[in-house]
């Protein structure tokens, strides 16, 4: 292959390769209210995301993390500094270990979420329900405190 052909091929790879990187995530969460009105979309980097919040009774920080596996939303793991009301580990559902920052980590839950979506009742701003994927954050409590929202996994591939 001639030097000019190598240069052309290199330029094409740079142009189309960077376009693929800039194309964005393959999945997003579509966030709708109880009347099915679209509130917003939340991009998922590498198909992973977490929901952080403060327990409404004890105020402890809780983190549930999800991943997308072959187009299916799955609960991956949960970090709970304390087993407050409604929290805890159930035999046969993940592995309970100590978390390096304290509390409990329930790892390897790998539980499919039916219908690729879940309903949450968004807490007040002190609860701070927040979606996090890589460096993107969306505080749902600032957006829709007290509302029932549906978080639905959507493929952005067409």
Segments (PLM) and residue ranges:
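Bacterial N-terminal signal peptides
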Residues: 8-16
């Amino acid at each position: 292959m001639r030097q000019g052909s190598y240069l052309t091929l290199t330029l094409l790879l740079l142009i189309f390769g960077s376009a693929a990187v800039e194309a964005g995530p393959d999945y997003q969460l579509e966030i709708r209210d109880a009347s099915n009105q679209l509130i917003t979309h939340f991009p998922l980097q590498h198909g992973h995301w977490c929901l952080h919040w403060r327990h409404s009774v004890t105020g402890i920080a809780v983190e549930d993390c999800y991943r997308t596996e072959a187009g299916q939303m799955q609960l991956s793991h949960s970090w709970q500094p304390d087993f407050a009301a409604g929290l805890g580990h159930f035999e046969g559902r993940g592995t309970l270990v100590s978390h390096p920052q304290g509390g409990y980590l329930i790892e390897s839950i790998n539980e499919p979420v039916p219908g690729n979506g879940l309903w949450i009742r968004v807490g007040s701003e002190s609860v701070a329900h927040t979606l996090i994927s890589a460096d993107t954050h969306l505080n749902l409590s600032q957006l829709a405190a007290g509302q029932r929202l549906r978080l639905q996994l959507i493929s952005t591939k067409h």
